[in-house]
Amino acid sequence: MEGGCKVIITTSREPSKKTLELVNDLVNSLPGTSKIVRGKKSFITLLEEAVACGARYIAFIWERRGMPFALLFYDVINREWKPYMLKISGIKTRREFPVFISRRPPAKSAVIVDLSEGEVGDIFTEIFGYPILYSLDAVRGLFDTVVLIRRTDGYLVELLGSDLGPRASSIRIKKVVYRHV
């Protein structure tokens, strides 16, 4: 990966602690990602930093009323927004799990296991570039992070460790919204 990162993860301005914790968990769990602290930076400044890093995409976590609300993607090379937005209906941080989950060392490998066989797995594969499988049995102990996508009312995206136990926050996606860009 050129420059050490393929995807930059950032937030809207002045994010809440919960959103920052989600960003930190994602960066620690997903290889090839890094974060940019937004602060008061303009969109152009974010693009310049992404180009300097060698990133292909920027993942924005938008928030509303202090909670992550949507995940949007910007293609740095083609200079255009991706035509989909993942609406987040809730997240569960490491602190909210019933057992203590310590922060693990940064992941070096990842795989997507899409049990829902829906569009979220394809979107994650396109953005992050991880291989996609449709069975959980084949991945135990082979990857540092397993991105498990299950169908609920929407989708549930869980970041699991190599032992298939929780590694980081889980994200509940209400729906995928396709928009005209």
Curated annotation (Swiss-Prot):
Q: Which domain of life is it from?
A: Archaea
**GO MF annotation terms:** rRNA binding
Write down the SMART domains for this protein, in alphabetical order: Brix (SM00879)
Q: Which GO terms describe its biological process?
A: rRNA processing
Q: Which UniProt keywords apply?
A: Ribosome biogenesis
The answer on whether this UniProt entry bears the keyword Transcription reads no
Q: Where is the Brix domain?
A: 5-181
What the protein does comes down to: Probably involved in the biogenesis of the ribosome.
Q: Name the HAMAP family for this protein.
A: BriX
Q: What is this protein called?
A: Probable Brix domain-containing ribosomal biogenesis protein
Q: Taxonomically, what lineage is the organism?
A: Archaea, Thermoproteota, Thermoprotei, Thermoproteales, Thermoproteaceae
